[in-house]
Structures are given as structure tokens and as C-alpha cells.
């Protein structure tokens, strides 16, 4: 981000575009960059990453979210045949569910208060449940709802000595954590996960660039198009944004076209 609220401000940080001028190995290539949204900008060549040839640019905008999801999965260390719940079916939660769903024999359930997210879960080949029907006795739970009620659901879904990985972003807000009841007697673990550093289990060997490259390669599955809404133009955005931001819009990732 650049600038100050309320204005002027350059917002956003995930950009996919074509290199108009630069080193020969990048010129004319489609690249991913962490940069505020705008139609043209100058960055060092080291700040961009070429997309795999098979990856559509529209899906590559999920790269930063996939990095967050991958880091959280490393922090949680799920295994084959584990029962896993993901509370919060936003873009990051859905990507965690997608990654866990590829583990042999794992029982993966995406949990959300919005019943429309069931269709996303279906397209990702994982189960769906409302919070009141969330699975119990889980080996591992990911909390990605950024709500106190979601964290409570995550803890309630744990089996004895299970782990909750919290990858929510609460900002400066404070939430209540239900550490009473059987939290201690059941020896539950609450682990924080944040994409700012590579997960400890990988940090000695993995750089951030290697992690980003892995995230881009993991986006090669076309099932992930279920998370992406059709693009709107930057010119139309002022009129479209109010509807996009409505809680009932069901939009997980809104593409914006600056061309």
C-alpha cells in the first residue's frame, strides 16, 4: 500500500501483468508482483516472478493467498487419514481446504455460516458443514474466519490433544478466546500462523521466493477457478464496488482489469 487514508491512497498488493520493458528474459512475459493496484508501474526485475506457462493470469492473482494457505498447512502438519476442519470459507480458508483435500485419506470439511459456500466446497471435492454441524473429534482444525465465534467453533471441533492453527487477521481488534471448559484438560494446542515468515519447519531450507514459486505451481488446478469472480474494469469499479463488498455477494476473489 502507498499513501494515507482517506486520500490519496494506492490500495491492493496482488498484481498480475505483462512486462512492457525490461530484461530480455522478462520482456513480454506475464509476471506476478506484490504491488499496489494500477495500470502501469516500474519495479526492479527482482520484484516480479514469471508465471508457469500453464497458469492462467486470472488464477495467478491467488498467489499471495496460496502462500498464506501453504504456510498454514506447514504449521499444522496434517497427515494421511487425518480428520481436518477449516473454519471460515473465505479465499484463504478454501485454499487450505484444497491443499488438505489432496492428502491421502484425509477427511476434510469446510465450515462456514454462509450456506452458499457449500458449492465452493463441492467444487474443491471437500465436505461442507454449518458451524452447528461442524465435525467433532478432529485431529487438526484451521481457523480462518477472523471471528471469535469461529475460534470457538474451531476449539469445539478438536479431539483430545488436537491443534488449532489460527491464520485469521484480526487487525487491532480484540476477541474473546474460550479457554475455559475443557481446553486445558483436553490439552488442546492453539498455534498462530502468519505468512510474514516461512513456517519454522521449512525455514532452514526454504526462501520466500521458493515458497512463492511453490504457491504458483499449486495454482495449476482449474478447480480453483471456483474462487474467482469475473473481472470488472477499473473504470466500472466505483459503480460495482458497493455490490461487490456486500456480505451477501458471495464473492471470494474479485478480479479487476486495468488494461
Identify what each model region corresponds to.
Residues 32-45:
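A structural motif shared across PLP-dependent enzymes of the aminotransferase-like
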Residues 119, 124-191:
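Glycine-rich cofactor phosphate-binding loops and adjacent beta1-alpha1 units
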Residues 178-228:
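C-terminal substrate-binding/catalytic core of Rossmann-like NAD(P)-dependent dehydrogenases/reductases
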Residues 206-259:
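C-terminal hydrophobic helical "lid"/dimerization subdomain
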Amino acid at each position: 500500500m502507498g499513501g494515507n487514508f482517506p486520500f490519496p491512497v494506492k490500495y491492493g498488493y496482488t498484481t498480475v501483468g505483462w512486462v512492457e520493458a525490461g530484461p530480455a528474459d522478462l520482456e513480454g512475459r506475464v509476471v506476478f508482483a506484490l504491488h499496489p493496484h494500477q495500470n502501469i508501474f516500474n519495479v526492479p526485475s527482482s520484484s516480479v516472478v514469471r508465471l508457469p506457462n500453464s497458469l492462467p493470469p486470472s488464477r495467478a492473482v491467488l498467489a499471495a493467498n496460496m502462500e498464506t494457505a501453504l504456510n498454514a498447512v506447514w504449521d499444522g502438519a496434517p497427515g494421511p487419514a487425518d480428520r481436518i476442519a477449516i473454519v471460515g470459507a473465505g479465499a484463504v480458508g478454501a485454499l487450505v481446504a484444497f491443499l488438505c483435500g489432496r492428502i491421502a485419506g484425509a477427511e476434510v470439511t469446510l465450515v462456514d455460516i454462509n450456506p452458499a459456500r457449500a458449492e465452493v466446497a463441492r467444487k474443491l471435492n471437500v465436505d461442507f458443514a454449518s458451524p452447528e454441524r461442524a465435525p467433532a473429534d478432529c485431529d487438526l482444525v484451521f481457523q480462518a474466519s477472523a471471528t471469535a465465534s469461529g475460534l470457538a467453533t474451531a476449539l469445539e471441533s478438536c479431539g483430545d490433544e488436537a491443534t488449532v492453527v489460527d491464520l485469521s487477521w484480526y487487525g487491532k481488534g480484540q476477541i474473546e478466546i474460550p479457554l475455559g471448559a475443557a481446553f486445558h484438560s483436553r490439552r488442546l494446542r492453539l498455534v498462530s500462523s502468519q505468512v510474514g515468515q516461512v513456517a519454522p519447519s521449512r525455514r532452514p531450507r526454504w526462501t520466500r521466493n521458493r515458497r512463492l514459486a511453490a504457491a504458483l505451481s499449486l495454482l495449476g488446478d482449474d478447480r480453483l477457478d471456483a474462487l474467482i469472480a469475473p473481472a470488472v474494469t477499473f473504470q466500472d469499479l466505483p459503480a460495482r464496488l458497493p455490490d461487490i463488498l456486500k456480505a451477501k455477494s458471495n464473492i471470494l476473489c474479485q478480479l479487476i482489469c486495468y488494461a
